[in-house]
Amino acid sequence: MATPGNLGSSVLASKTKTKKKHFVAQKVKLFRASDPLLSVLMWGVNHSINELSHVQIPVMLMPDDFKAYSKIKVDNHLFNKENMPSHFKFKEYCPMVFRNLRERFGIDDQDFQNSLTRSAPLPNDSXARSGARFHTSYDRRYVIKTITSEDVAEMHNILKNYHQHIVECHGITLLPQFLGMYRLNVDGVEIYVIVTRNVFSHRLSVYRKYDLKGSTVAREASDKEKAKELPTLKDNDFINEGQKIYIDDNXKKVFLEKLKKDVEFLAQLKLMDYSLLVGIHDVERAEQEEVECEENDGEEEGESDGTHPVGTPPDSPGNTLNSSPPLAPGEFDPNIDVYGIKCHENSPRKEVYFMAIIDILTHYDAKKKAAHAAKXVKHGAGAEISTVNPEQYSKRFLDFIGHILT
């Protein structure tokens, strides 16, 4: 992939255009992770946010900010290799743009930094056809996904339009909330990652998960997927189970208005193959599991040898997760869990739904047109295949989602 163009006018970009080599003693703050690439991501995000905190925030973004990057190379024999690789490179794409997006999504840079650097991100077994790997930040607020160099190029192609869309909708969207994009190099291994806000709640567990495209051809989870603790189910699974999303008329109206606006934006950019990710929290089930957990904890305490339990260290995940005021069962903070919607009063079960659009970086190009032609021959022209043109895709997607909300 071609490296994004010249750095242009942003203050940060002009400071970081040239390659830096750092020979510094490792500070007290450690970035321990089982994977060296994760350690480098933690180090890089920490470095980036610290750099941004010293930069004057421009009144408006300039065209060159959408091509800018900052890059740093570290060669340091003083680093403790148990905690950090001694040689690595870290590159951040369009730092001022993503800083501006975080602000528009109501995310404070210090909070973002803490979420990604205080403790190592947690692996997530979510499957992607592309082979992408997923992690969540330790506090479960953000998702870190590996992407391809083609995805990075597509992100650069749409970033200006995406930013404008976020400005126009005042940050209230069902699109992925893109918060940072990075390249990491360690020991000859190069990966690209993108950070987004987690669609699911950071505290309410999801017991059912669906990836919905509005297509019925080959849209069923495999037996291997279904064997997982939390499988990603698909359209035919949703239909065959008779699943519905029970939200009241006002919540439905607001949701569909946002969805329509976002999907029209994607169609204009000729983007397709996106999905609605749906997570369902069962309030009564979660309460029951909590009671069982407390009973088990009580039994274990009764069997203890009388010594005092070790307290939660200040930097541990538990400390931050429990720092917010306690919420009643099924309640959530809408400033954090922005995609959450409660079920209506007549729902057969008391549920909370977390729904947003994911995987928006597929452009309708010659490859997709060829795939559409091949599938149409195989399944027939009227079949509900997923590779249709962006206008058809968006219409079918909106129709399907409209029908599952009740």
Swiss-Prot record:
Species this protein is from: Sus scrofa (Pig)
Annotated GO CC locations: cytosol; lysosome; nucleus; photoreceptor inner segment; photoreceptor outer segment; plasma membrane
Summary of the function given for this chain in its UniProt record: Catalyzes the phosphorylation of phosphatidylinositol 5-phosphate (PtdIns5P) on the fourth hydroxyl of the myo-inositol ring, to form phosphatidylinositol 4,5-bisphosphate (PtdIns(4,5)P2). Has both ATP- and GTP-dependent kinase activities. May exert its function by regulating the levels of PtdIns5P, which functions in the cytosol by increasing AKT activity and in the nucleus signals through ING2. May regulate the pool of cytosolic PtdIns5P in response to the activation of tyrosine phosphorylation.
Region (Disordered): 288-329
GO molecular function: 1-phosphatidylinositol-4-phosphate 5-kinase activity; 1-phosphatidylinositol-5-phosphate 4-kinase activity; ATP binding; protein homodimerization activity
Protein known as: Phosphatidylinositol 5-phosphate 4-kinase type-2 alpha
Region span, Required for interaction with PIP5K1A: 59-65
Catalytic activity: a 1,2-diacyl-sn-glycero-3-phospho-(1D-myo-inositol-5-phosphate) + ATP = a 1,2-diacyl-sn-glycero-3-phospho-(1D-myo-inositol-4,5-bisphosphate) + ADP + H(+); 1,2-dihexadecanoyl-sn-glycero-3-phospho-(1D-myo-inositol-5-phosphate) + ATP = 1,2-dihexadecanoyl-sn-glycero-3-phospho-(1D-myo-inositol-4,5-bisphosphate) + ADP + H(+); 1,2-dihexadecanoyl-sn-glycero-3-phospho-(1D-myo-inositol-5-phosphate) + GTP = 1,2-dihexadecanoyl-sn-glycero-3-phospho-(1D-myo-inositol-4,5-bisphosphate) + GDP + H(+)
Phosphothreonine, modified sites: T3
Record has Protein biosynthesis as a keyword: no
GO BP of this protein: 1-phosphatidyl-1D-myo-inositol 4,5-bisphosphate biosynthetic process; autophagosome-lysosome fusion; negative regulation of insulin receptor signaling pathway; phosphatidylinositol phosphate biosynthetic process; regulation of autophagy; vesicle-mediated cholesterol transport
Subunit and interaction comment: Homodimer. Interacts with PIP4K2B; the interaction may regulate localization to the nucleus. Probably interacts with PIP5K1A; the interaction inhibits PIP5K1A kinase activity.
